[in-house]
Amino acid sequence: MANLKEIRAKVASIKSTQKITRAMQMVAASKMRRAQERMAQGRPYADNMRRVIAHLVQANPEYKHRYMVDRPVKRVGYIIVSSDRGLAGGLNINLFKKVVQHVKAQQEQSIEVQFALIGQKAVSFFKNYGGKVLGATTQIGDAPSLEQLTGSVQVMLDAFDKGELDRIYLVSNGFVNAMTQKPKVEQLVPLAPAEEGDDLNRTYGWDYIYEPEAEELLNGLLVRYIESMVYQGVIENVACEQSARMVAMKAATDNAGQLIKDLQLIYNKLRQAAITQEISEIVGGAAAV
């Protein structure tokens, strides 16, 4: 059994670690709130762009853009959004399980898969998992910009334009609340079929005059919209990362507190036993005299 000095040293070490985990919990909570604000700020941009695209499509029904037309699926691309750092519980592990499950379903249908990776954790995972990686982006930070992500998006769109991919998916973590994050798979290209009530399925009674031509404008808008969807996915993933880290650090802080209590109990018992032993020896010595 450890002696009193060893237990005191262990308690001091755990208390030091507890201070670190408590500080990390507070930092993660602050970063999570900022990421949530960026999520809220980015949604109106994507929503308004989707409405303009919907109007352009309805105003020019004869023009079928390649990003809105389904074709036989033989090759599929995945844009995987992960974090650069760990200490976020099972956030990335659950995401990769979702990817592997989805990829396996594609491969069972003899569909080839390719990847574009965002985040160091995804790069490390697919280095072991294998697969054809078209591009990778790491070190995006807690406040990523759209410019950091365009490379990974463009390499997938180029492959789609060349006929090397027939469908592109975005895989990222969805923010439910501060305690819950769920991995999700969204179809990016071709744009997923419109659901009832969706902007792409809505009839508008107003008209615009477009400069330049609507077809040229649609070409640029669709690329920009796809980039904004990936950006929104990355921002949401940052919020998920920080919330998962906040929860993980809170659990670590609580566990450290419980461990300190257990060690202090052991310390007190050992100290009590040592004092009792000393008293017994003194009493025994006095009796002998």
Swiss-Prot record:
Keyword Transport on entry: yes
Principal location: membrane
GO MF entries: ATP binding; proton-transporting ATP synthase activity, rotational mechanism
Matches recorded under InterPro entries: ATP_synth_F1_ATPase_gsu (IPR035968), ATP_synth_F1_gsu (IPR000131), ATP_synth_F1_gsu_CS (IPR023632)
A single Gene Ontology CC term: plasma membrane
A single GO BP: proton motive force-driven plasma membrane ATP synthesis
Superkingdom, natural source: Bacteria
SUPFAM superfamilies: ATP synthase (F1-ATPase), gamma subunit
Location(s), subcellular: Cell inner membrane
UniProt keyword terms in alphabetical order: ATP synthesis, Cell inner membrane, Cell membrane, CF(1), Hydrogen ion transport, Ion transport, Membrane, Transport
Membrane topology label: Peripheral membrane protein
Subunit structure, as described in the record: F-type ATPases have 2 components, CF(1) - the catalytic core - and CF(0) - the membrane proton channel. CF(1) has five subunits: alpha(3), beta(3), gamma(1), delta(1), epsilon(1). CF(0) has three main subunits: a, b and c.
Family the entry assigns: Belongs to the ATPase gamma chain family.
NCBIfam families: ATPsyn_F1gamma (TIGR01146), PRK05621.1-1 (NF004144)
Biological role stated in the UniProt entry: Produces ATP from ADP in the presence of a proton gradient across the membrane. The gamma chain is believed to be important in regulating ATPase activity and the flow of protons through the CF(0) complex.
Protein name per UniProt: ATP synthase gamma chain
Species, as recorded: Acinetobacter baumannii (strain ATCC 17978 / DSM 105126 / CIP 53.77 / LMG 1025 / NCDC KC755 / 5377)
